[in-house]
Amino acid sequence: MLPLQVSSLGVEGEGIWLALGTVGMLLGMVYFMAKGWDVQDPEQEEFYVITILIAGIAASSYLSMFFGFGLTEVELVNGRVIDVYWARYADWLFTTPLLLLDIGLLAGASNRDMASLITIDAFMIVTGLAATLMKVPVARYAFWTISTIAMLFVLYYLVVVVGEAASDASEEAQSTFNVLRNIILVAWAIYPVAWLVGTEGLGLVGLFGETLLFMILDLTAKIGFGFILLRSRAIVGGDSAPTPSAEAAD
């Protein structure tokens, strides 16, 4: 049986943020499902399915963390013990590629470009998890650096390569792409900073504040992202996002 402080309130009372995160993700998922309930167009359905999956996976992750699952202790070689919610990384390993897939479909990016982008993204998440679980501080910061560099590649690829594909899209699709791209650029850039100043890095922010920050970032990058995407005329009608050509998909 899980200790009360882990199963309900968390290690430092951060359970309140995990509960709010769970509710926020569930509400977002229900909203997306209700909005897409009567959608018949296959291309529109694709956006709804992906966005609902993102919210559902995130809700499951937050709920598991609230009940104390996906939480472990990492004892460093210097004796410092860190409480780590590794379930975040399991969440991100699935949801970040889906977010990129959503925006890639909107932009009309080729399958090859999206495969490259998602591969780099997965590498970013895995090396971030490695940084979190390493017991030697130098190794932790080394893998954090590698993960951050990978993130910069992801953001660069999103702006330059996917952005170029979006330039051929309709005006409405371009406008929506620009907003979603900026959400990803700002929110994702904050994640490694949050790691660095939080309990997994320098310890300048406790687990309570760190969990609050991650919750805000997650809700913005997932539910906020989905809300804007699925309200766009490029998705719901009146304008259409491009689809990758057969030549671009090669």
Swiss-Prot record:
The chain crosses the membrane at residues 14-34, 49-69, 89-109, 114-134, 142-162, 183-203, 210-230. Induction: Expressed constitutively throughout the growth phases, both in presence and absence of white light. The keyword Transmembrane applies. GO terms for molecular function: monoatomic ion channel activity; photoreceptor activity. Keywords: Chromophore, Hydrogen ion transport, Ion transport, Membrane, Photoreceptor protein, Receptor, Retinal protein, Sensory transduction, Transmembrane, Transmembrane helix, Transport. GO terms for biological process: phototransduction; proton transmembrane transport. The record marks D91 as: Primary proton acceptor. Its main location: membrane. The covalent binding of retinal to the apoprotein, bacterioopsin, generates bacteriorhodopsin. It is found in: Membrane. The keyword Transmembrane applies. One of its GO terms (cellular component) is membrane. CDD domains: 7tm_bacteriorhodopsin. It is a multi-pass membrane protein. It holds the Pfam family Bac_rhodopsin. The modification N6-(retinylidene)lysine is found at K222. Belongs to the archaeal/bacterial/fungal opsin family. Light-driven proton pump. This is Bacteriorhodopsin-II. It comes from Haloarcula marismortui (strain ATCC 43049 / DSM 3752 / JCM 8966 / VKM B-1809) (Halobacterium marismortui).
